């Protein structure tokens, strides 16, 4: 499967945190994805961009916090994360560029 332009719109960036590193030991990778993307779109994009087989996709939406900026109230954007579990034998090196 070849990568299309819309696949790059679905996957925004990999998330590299302590929790994401711990899940990578179990064969999962964490990505920030477009807020309007769904699980089949995420699965198709990861398989096309990285050439791996996806076993499961779990998503979470983190609501943006209300913050004060120069005396004005503002809101950070909502973030959607996708926990992508890979089939056995497949790996993704997230330290390389997309």
Swiss-Prot record:
Q: Which UniProt keywords apply?
A: Ribonucleoprotein, Ribosomal protein, RNA-binding, rRNA-binding
Query: Which is one Gene Ontology cellular component term of this protein?
Result: ribonucleoprotein complex
UniProt cross-references to SUPFAM superfamilies, sorted A to Z:
Ribosomal proteins S24e, L23 and L15e
InterPro entries from the entry? Nucleotide-bd_a/b_plait_sf, Ribosomal_uL23-like, Ribosomal_uL23/eL15/eS24_sf
Q: Which PANTHER family match?
A: 60S RIBOSOMAL PROTEIN L23A
Q: Which NCBIfam families match?
A: PRK05738.1-3, PRK05738.1-5, PRK05738.2-4
Q: How does it assemble?
A: Part of the 50S ribosomal subunit. Contacts protein L29, and trigger factor when it is bound to the ribosome.
Function summary: One of the early assembly proteins it binds 23S rRNA. One of the proteins that surrounds the polypeptide exit tunnel on the outside of the ribosome. Forms the main docking site for trigger factor binding to the ribosome.
Q: What is this protein called?
A: Large ribosomal subunit protein uL23
Could you tell me which species this protein originates from? Roseobacter denitrificans (strain ATCC 33942 / OCh 114) (Erythrobacter sp. (strain OCh 114))
Origin organism lineage? Bacteria, Pseudomonadati, Pseudomonadota, Alphaproteobacteria, Rhodobacterales
